[in-house]
Amino acid sequence: MYAVIAAGGKQHRVEEGEVLRLEKIEVATGETVDFDQVLLVGSGADVKIGTPVVEGAKVTAEVVSHGRADKVTIIKFKRRKHHMKRQGHRQWYTEVKITGIQG
């Protein structure tokens, strides 16, 4: 069984037992989180598509860890002007393990 959920402004295809990196969620490590915005639920040839969400469907997950992604370096450069600006960014993420799909 699989599902498509909306979390953190993105859509993710998930299956039970899968570990997934999402945008940061303010939930402590080890706690469970429920995703109610389930856009699609499928099991073999049986597929339920929501308009926009599937009624009564829910995906539960356990928070595994929080962290920061690899650094992305931004460089702004103006030619012939001796001007260069460097900046780095590391995005926070939450790693969750999908424990159940209902619907």
Swiss-Prot record:
PROSITE patterns: RIBOSOMAL_L21. GO terms for molecular function: rRNA binding; structural constituent of ribosome. The lineage of its organism: Bacteria, Pseudomonadati, Pseudomonadota, Gammaproteobacteria, Cellvibrionales. Keywords: Ribonucleoprotein, Ribosomal protein, RNA-binding, rRNA-binding. GO terms for cellular component: cytoplasm; ribonucleoprotein complex; ribosome. Belongs to the bacterial ribosomal protein bL21 family. This protein binds to 23S rRNA in the presence of protein L20. PANTHER family: 50S RIBOSOMAL PROTEIN L21, LARGE RIBOSOMAL SUBUNIT PROTEIN BL21M. Signal peptide: none annotated. Part of the 50S ribosomal subunit. Contacts protein L20. GO terms for biological process: translation. The keyword Lipoprotein does not apply. It comes from the Bacteria. This is Large ribosomal subunit protein bL21.
